[in-house]
């Protein structure tokens, strides 16, 4: 069992963020990772579960042991019961080890009230026989002083040459140079880091966005009255302005993520903020001070801003005192802020020395495809594919943001179908930086070039030029023609268009792949422990046995293409012993699929619980090669598939990616209803990988 003990050199180094990122890095190596925070250190105002433990549980789907309370630990230390305390901690540590390859243990943070933290950390590291990784955050100090501070902490655990003291991770690095250049300069000034005994295991740059709380968090921490909640669950405060100036001087400051603080009687500022919100600027919110609220007639004029999601809060304190409170807000990650926790986790993981850490841990007992690994590999493979993906709904704000992310990270070469001025306006309003190389094509200017090719493709259906021109008024049809002519590699739509509007042009112009007679779909279900494939939950209402067999083969091929070993369960309400028309259909579909793909591991009919649960499988289907370990679930009809997908997703705390369409000659994918930026990014990545597999 490998154990990494994460020890801070000082207060405020961001220890929890490093723990989140380290667990993610180790998971990406296919390792089964446990986490353990032996001693809870609640922040002022914390009333729920211990923060680090709960955040790791929610972001990684693991269940760490509950930490000991700080009061209990201090009582035992005060009574001279250090040995008994360590025994208690080791018992909890053993729980964290069960079934895992490696355990990350988060040490105590030294505070004004816990000056003994360093001594306790030393005893913990030795008692757990752990390898120590120090975490430090550079202050405004010369590099030699930073090196000296780190070396002093390393001495507490046996010194930098002790084989159990691995190295240091530097967090919140504030510099204009790249992290690679900073690391090189640090090594030049630090003899400690020049050899292989004590390594620099990561440099994480300071990123203000990582500290941006939700507007809801701001309201709760201030005890503010919520006059209009709007989008306060989603919007984040990245900057604050105190309005004691004219409207003309305030307007340039009304940008994405800004919290505007002003007395409630400043009608001019309130109206200016409302106009900015109506024009699409996603402000963090409007905070009214001095316990004064605007006249109801003014609020009536703000109705459009309220409908646009502008949060409005009110506090009794004056603007100066409110500003002081805002500057002293607790910026720790709330345990229910999954979006921010995931962002920090991936950001930290991307700056750690993953190759060395993976090598240090060796080969896992059994490679596993966790959700974190699946998402990571999805992005990596899409980057390698380097495909050109067209987005017909090009001026939609969520799509513009997703396209900018994909372009900047090299996930895909995105093509937005929209007027460039519309995209620019969206980007300005939303605070989106459009990266170089992001293509924006005006449908009005390119529509004419596709009339003749479309007539040729549809001549068997007697399509003429005027009919083609009319259909090409739809940007989805233009995008589909671009795909048909190999100008792009894939298409993603459906944010505002219906599934039918996305799929119909593809069926007419792209058609099904060779060997396919139908188009079906799969969802990738990301559960805490594994990733499963569900098909078909979108396309085929009542498939025949032959169609169900084809869906099974398509779904197995999709699983294989995305790194999931396909073990296909053909789902039915009853086990193999029952006999009626529906069960017989599933049985026949299983036989047809086995005959068509003899290498495929497939079984059915199987009840869902027998396919998914090893204990039930041993009772209901002991001889099945799939029961209890299925990775691909094929449902007998659309009603069953769609209902199961939604119910299981909600009850099992799962996240679904998809639907991903399969069976088309070229990849076209429909976005799920209510898709957010992450959903769109992942759908673009899925499409890029499909395109690379198809080639």
Curated annotation (Swiss-Prot):
Reaction(s) catalysed by this chain's protein: acetyl-CoA + phosphate = acetyl phosphate + CoA
Keyword Protein transport: no
GO molecular function, one term: phosphate acetyltransferase activity
Main location: cytoplasm
Any one GO biological process: acetyl-CoA biosynthetic process
SUPFAM superfamilies documented for this protein: HprK N-terminal domain-like, Isocitrate/Isopropylmalate dehydrogenase-like, P-loop containing nucleoside triphosphate hydrolases
This protein's pathway: Metabolic intermediate biosynthesis; acetyl-CoA biosynthesis; acetyl-CoA from acetate: step 2/2
Positions of transmembrane segments: none
Cellular-component GO terms for this entry: cytoplasm
Keywords carried by this UniProt record: Acyltransferase, Cytoplasm, Transferase
UniProt-listed NCBIfam families: PRK05632.1 (NF004167), PRK09653.1 (NF007233), pta (TIGR00651)
Annotated domain remarks: The N-terminal region seems to be important for proper quaternary structure. The C-terminal region contains the substrate-binding site.
Entry's family note: In the N-terminal section; belongs to the CobB/CobQ family. In the C-terminal section; belongs to the phosphate acetyltransferase and butyryltransferase family.
Subunit structure and binding partners: Homohexamer.
Protein name: Phosphate acetyltransferase
Organism: Pseudomonas putida (strain ATCC 47054 / DSM 6125 / CFBP 8728 / NCIMB 11950 / KT2440)
């Amino acid at each position: 069992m490998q154990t990494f003990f994460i020890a801070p050199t000082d207060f405020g180094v961001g220890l929890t963020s490093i723990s989140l990122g380290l667990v993610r890095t180790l998971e990406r190596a296919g390792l089964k990772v446990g986490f353990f925070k032996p001693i809870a250190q609640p922040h002022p105002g914390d009333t729920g579960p211990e923060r680090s433990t709960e955040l790791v549980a929610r972001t990684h789907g693991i269940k760490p042991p509950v930490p000991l309370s700080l009061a209990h630990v201090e009582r035992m230390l005060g009574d001279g019961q250090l040995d008994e305390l360590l025994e208690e901690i080791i018992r909890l540590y053993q729980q964290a080890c069960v079934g895992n390859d490696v355990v990350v243990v988060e040490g105590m943070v030294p505070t004004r009230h816990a000056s003994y933290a360093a001594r306790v950390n030393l005893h913990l590291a030795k008692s757990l026989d752990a390898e120590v990784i120090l975490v430090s955050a550079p202050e405004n100090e010369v590099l030699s002083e930073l090196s000296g501070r780190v070396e002093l902490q390393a001495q507490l655990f046996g010194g930098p040459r002790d084989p159990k003291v691995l190295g240091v991770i530097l967090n919140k690095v504030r510099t204009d140079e790249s992290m690679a250049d900073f690391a090189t300069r640090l090594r030049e000034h630090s003899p400690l880091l020049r050899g292989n005994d004590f390594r620099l295991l990561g440099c994480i740059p300071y990123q203000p966005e990582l500290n941006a709380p939700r507007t809801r968090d701001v309201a709760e921490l201030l005890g503010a009255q919520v006059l209009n909640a709007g989008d306060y669950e989603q919007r984040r405060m990245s900057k604050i302005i105190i309005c004691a100036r004219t409207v003309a001087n305030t307007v340039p400051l009304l940008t994405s993520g800004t919290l505007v603080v002003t007395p409630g009687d400043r009608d001019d500022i309130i109206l200016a903020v409302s106009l900015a919100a109506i024009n699409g600027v996603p402000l963090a919110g409007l905070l009214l001070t001095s316990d004064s609220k605007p006249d109801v007639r003014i609020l009536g004029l703000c109705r459009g801003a309220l409908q646009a999601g502008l949060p409005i809060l009110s506090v009794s304190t004056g603007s100066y005192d409110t500003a002081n409170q805002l500057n002293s807000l607790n910026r720790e990650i709330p345990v229910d802020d999954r979006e921010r926790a995931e962002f920090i986790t991936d950001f930290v993981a991307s700056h750690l020395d993953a190759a060395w850490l993976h090598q240090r841990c060796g080969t896992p007992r059994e490679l596993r495809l966790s959700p974190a690994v699946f998402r990571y590999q999805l992005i990596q493979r899409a980057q390698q594919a380097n495909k050109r993906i067209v987005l017909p709904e090009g001026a939609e704000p969520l799509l513009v943001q997703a396209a900018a992310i994909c372009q900047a990270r090299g996930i895909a070469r995105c093509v937005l179908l929209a007027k460039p001025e519309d995209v620019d306006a969206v980007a300005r309003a939303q605070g989106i930086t459009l990266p170089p190389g992001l293509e924006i094509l005006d449908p009005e200017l390119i529509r004419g070039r596709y009339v003749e090719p479309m007539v040729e493709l549809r001549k068997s259906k007697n399509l003429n030029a005027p009919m083609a021109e009319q259909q090409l008024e739809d940007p989805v049809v233009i995008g589909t023609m671009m795909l048909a002519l190999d100008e792009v590699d894939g298409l993603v739509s459906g944010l505002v268009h219906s599934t039918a509007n996305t799929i119909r042009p593809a069926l007419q112009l792209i058609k099904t792949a060779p060997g396919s007679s139908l188009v079906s779909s799969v969802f990738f279900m990301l559960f805490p422990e594994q990733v499963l494939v569900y098909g078909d939950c979108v396309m085929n209402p009542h498939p025949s046995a032959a169609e169900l067999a084809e869906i099974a083969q398509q779904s197995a091929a999709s699983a294989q293409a995305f790194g999931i070993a396909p073990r296909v369960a053909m789902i039915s309400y009853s086990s193999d012993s029952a006999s009626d028309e529906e069960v017989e259909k599933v049985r026949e579909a299983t036989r047809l699929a086995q005959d068509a793909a003899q290498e495929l591991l497939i079984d059915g009919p199987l009840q869902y619980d027998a396919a998914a649960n090893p204990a039930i499988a041993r009772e209901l289907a002991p001889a099945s090669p799939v029961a209890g370990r299925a990775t691909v679930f094929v449902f007998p009809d659309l009603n069953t598939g769609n209902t199961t997908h939604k119910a299981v997703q909600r009850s099992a705390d799962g996240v679904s990616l998809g639907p991903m369409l399969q069976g088309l000659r070229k990849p076209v994918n429909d976005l799920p209803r209510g898709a957010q930026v992450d959903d769109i990014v992942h759908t673009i990545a899925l499409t890029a990988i499909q395109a690379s597999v198809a080639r």
